[in-house]
Structure formats: structure tokens, C-alpha cells
């Protein structure tokens, strides 16, 4: 069986060996997910007061996940998974159903897109909405793990933010797709602490902060 590289949740089960297993333990669902876009900028001002702005670093998303009160069994599915990846600095994926659009599903990308462009041409844009979050699947490039937001829709062309991180060549073997139904973000644990508490009834209170990473 393959190693489970997605944070365990009701759709991504894990067994005691850390593998994907449909008969394994389901992770708890999220009570809330906060998504933040971080785009550092530099602002310089002239003596006359004019402001000159420039992007100083790459854009990334951060994710703040909160859980409802957890039983010990539920807690012990997700917490060891996160601890192991915090200690090893290993990246993993988190599935974000709250930001998915199951009606849109997956759409084939039908035209090449160069790195730095902000547009993608799809087979159709049926049921896609402005502000939808999506990831892409490029069979010839498994390092394209960035997620994007739709900012405009014009016929079969969507405008996205941030700009496309890696080139997409549709002439290569396989089908390049934009995945709207259950976008997955590649992340690492943010910061040095993963804190939890246990109340008098034995229920666990727990949340975790993650940040997007491309490596």
C-alpha cells in the first residue's frame, strides 16, 4: 500500500502503518478552515510622496484548521501524523472540501500556459464560479503543486491568482486538468508548536496552522 500523504480526514483514511487504506481509520472532519493569501510587498516613497510598490516575495496560502471536540481515538489519528511530519520537515497534502466546488468537478486544460501567465483555457467553464479554489494535475510534471483562485471567467478562459507557477504543455502525454471538486494543497506545519488540551470529560481541543509549500 502507498504511504498516506494527505492529512487524514473522513475521505482520506490511514492504517497503523501510515498507509492509504479504505479499511483504516478516518481522520476527524474540520469544524472550520481559514484560508489566508500572503503576498509580501515593498513600498518606497519619493520625497514628493509618490509610492512605488513591488512584490518582494512569492505568494503563498496559509491554512488555519480548527476541529470540534475530539475523542481520544479521533485525536490519535491526526495528531501523530502531524507530529511525525513536523519532526521530519516533510510536506504533505491537505484536502479542502470547504473550498471545493463539486458541481464544477475537474476540467481539461486545452491550451498551453506559460509560467507567469494569469489565464487558463479550459474545455468548458460550466459551474465554475469566481473565487473557486483549484489545483492542477499535469501528468508530465508532478512538481506542479500550487493552488490558485479564479478571479474572472470569460467564455472558456479563466483568470487566476496568483500567476501560473510552472508551464503547462498540453501536447505532452496525458490529460492536464484543473481540479475544483476537492482541491489539495501541499503544506507544512507552520511554526514550532502543535498544541492541544484535554478537558475533564476526556475530550481533546485541537487546532493546527499550516502553510503552503512547493517542495
Spans of features found by a protein language model:
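Extracellular/virion structural assembly segments
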Residues: 1-215
Amino acid at each position: 500500500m502507498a504511504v498516506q500523504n494527505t492529512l487524514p480526514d473522513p475521505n482520506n483514511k490511514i492504517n497503523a502503518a501510515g498507509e492509504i487504506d479504505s479499511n483504516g481509520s478516518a481522520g476527524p472532519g474540520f469544524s472550520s478552515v481559514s484560508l489566508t493569501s500572503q503576498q509580501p510587498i515593498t513600498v518606497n516613497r519619493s520625497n514628493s510622496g509618490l509610492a512605488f510598490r513591488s512584490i518582494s516575495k512569492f505568494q503563498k496560502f496559509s491554512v488555519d484548521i480548527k476541529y470540534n471536540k475530539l475523542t481520544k481515538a479521533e485525536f490519535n489519528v491526526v495528531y501523530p501524523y502531524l507530529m511525525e511530519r513536523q519532526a521530519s520537515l516533510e510536506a504533505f497534502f491537505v484536502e479542502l472540501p470547504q473550498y471545493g466546488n463539486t458541481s464544477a468537478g475537474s476540467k481539461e486544460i486545452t491550451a498551453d500556459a506559460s509560467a507567469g501567465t494569469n489565464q487558463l483555457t479550459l474545455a468548458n467553464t460550466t459551474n465554475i464560479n469566481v473565487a473557486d479554489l483549484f489545483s492542477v494535475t499535469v501528468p508530465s510534471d508532478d512538481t506542479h503543486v500550487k493552488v490558485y483562485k479564479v478571479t474572472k471567467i470569460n467564455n472558456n478562459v479563466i483568470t487566476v491568482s496568483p500567476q501560473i507557477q510552472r508551464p503547462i504543455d498540453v501536447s505532452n502525454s496525458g490529460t492536464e486538468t484543473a481540479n475544483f471538486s476537492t482541491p489539495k494543497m501541499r503544506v507544512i506545519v507552520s511554526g514550532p508548536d502543535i498544541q492541544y488540551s484535554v478537558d475533564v470529560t476526556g475530550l481533546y481541543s485541537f487546532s493546527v496552522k499550516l502553510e503552503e509549500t512547493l517542495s
